[in-house]
Amino acid sequence: MRLQLCFILLHPLSTDWLLTHILIVNCQLSIVNYKKMNILLLGSGGREHAIAWKISQSPKVDKLFIAPGNAGTAQVGTNAYIKADDFAAIKDFVLANDVNMVVVGPEDPLVKGVYDFFKNDASLAGIPVIGPSKAGAQLEGSKDFAKAFMMRHNIPTARYKSITAENIAEGYAFLKSLPAPYVLKADGLAAGKGVLILETLEEAKKELGDMLNGMFGDASKTVVIEEFLTGIEC
């Protein structure tokens, strides 16, 4: 029950994903029966360094592995040179090292279905994975999906229109209906670089075309045009 309450309070309403990760892991550690646990943390960024640092402080942790990790995580755990989206290699590592829990830091392996991979494999299904399913990860992995979700559930959000190469004329018309500045967002994951804020209509039209033509690869096959909102991000 304690773990369920943590999820209710922190997901998906919280936008502080680092704090959410740490608190959920702490909740999980507090209810699992293992006296000592081997934990695998997926990722290689600063977020994973912070999560690894905190997990390493738990008296319930025996071994902490980070895949692939970085120089910072190497100071608090053991790096395993495996890509975070190489599910077959992750499976082999988990089974070989008696891993009791997997914590997922980056969005990419979640969007690709690492949670589902574990759940659907008989040899892995009993190992908790901290992170949403592939379906749940769409809220982060697709801005078009997330905006449609907000509209369906009456969650306040900026006006928007999703554009592909097939309806780019509608995109130009929607841009013209908006006041400057103009916000263009690649639908998919683009390593945090898929959002452009343009000051003029001409710039916005040009960048919309460039995005649809592969500026961010497959991530910008669909582009979400949003109304610009001024304020403090939650």
Predicted regions and their residues:
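Arg/Gly-rich low-complexity intrinsically disordered repeat tracts
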Residues: H11-W17, I24-Y34
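ATP-binding N-terminal substructure of ATP-dependent carboxylate-amine bond-forming enzymes
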Residues: Y34-P132
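Acidic/polar helix N-cap motif
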Residues: K83-D86, S142, E166-N167, T200
